[in-house]
Amino acid sequence: MKYRKLIILVLSILIILPVSTLDGHHIANADDDPPKKLKYKENSALALNYHRVRKANFLNNFIYFFSSSKEIKNYSVSQSQFESQIKWLKSHDAKFLTLKEFLYYKKKGKFPKRSVWINFDDMDETIYENAYPILKKYKIPATGFIITGHVGEENFHNLDMISKKELKEMYKTGLWEFETHTHDMHNLSKNNKSKLMKASEATIIKDLNKSEKYLTKNFKKSQKTIAYPYGLMNDDKLPVIKKAGLKYGFSLEEKAVTPNSNDYYIPRILISDDAFEHLIKRWDGFHEKD
């Protein structure tokens, strides 16, 4: 009877998940085609973006294997996968950068070989529970892009968000920097247009100023960067992003970063297990000689 109930629960989840994942939470780079090999340029760096790090247990693994949900397949890795990826990067002499270092080298015009910058969007509880301990174990720096108006909120688009107390614990390790993912503009309309893209100039500036104040108050000075909700931005909104005082913007795109990458369209590679296998492991930067 116990196992029968478990099977019914799992099947129910599989039916629900494909149509309820985060209210259409992510759409950038969410196609079903396998990733292609990254084009290699000698002076470049990899910005690796994560969203969810799942606990590696039977139920989660079962759901992952059988589900057609893009949220699960494209926007999450298991805890064991995440640690395996970090260990692979270390074994291939990746130079892990803080955000501050990443921006410094970009501005300077020269990245160290095998430069890697680890970052996370949304900052839900799975990052604190499953990614943070691994990064702390290996002393790897990371950046979290926070939806500052929803810190600690339960059931935000089906996610339990990380708490302020947990963020401060992470910050005190010296390994974490926190930047804005907007204050309260992480929503999609019915036509898959983000709230940020539809809002007026005054509304956007007010939102980003609130987020900046939160970050400055709790985590000292930020680097004046934003990870766009859903990785989406267009040119007609850039003037207001600049007017709000932001100096860099991050999208989601399967490209390495070069010094010439547009400061407001800096590409980050969305990491899933498949993306790491096809894109990161095959990147020529990890296979060239010093």
Swiss-Prot record:
Species for this entry: Staphylococcus aureus (strain MRSA252)
Family: Belongs to the polysaccharide deacetylase family.
Gene Ontology CC terms, in alphabetical order: extracellular region
Known role: Catalyzes the N-deacetylation of poly-beta-1,6-N-acetyl-D-glucosamine (PNAG, also referred to as PIA), a biofilm adhesin polysaccharide. N-deacetylation is crucial for attachment of the polysaccharide to the bacterial cell surface; it leads to the introduction of positive charges in the otherwise neutral PIA polymer, allowing electrostatic interactions.
Keywords: Cell wall, Hydrolase, Secreted, Signal
Signal sequence residues: 1-28
PANTHER family: POLY-BETA-1,6-N-ACETYL-D-GLUCOSAMINE N-DEACETYLASE (PTHR34216:SF3), PTHR34216
Top-rank taxon, per record: Bacteria
EC number annotated for this UniProt entry: 3.5.1.-
One Pfam family recorded for the sequence: Polysacc_deac_1
Chief location bin: secreted
PROSITE patterns: NODB (PS51677)
GO molecular function (one): hydrolase activity, acting on carbon-nitrogen (but not peptide) bonds, in linear amides
Isomerase as UniProt keyword: no
Protein name as catalogued: Poly-beta-1,6-N-acetyl-D-glucosamine N-deacetylase
UniProt GO BP: carbohydrate metabolic process
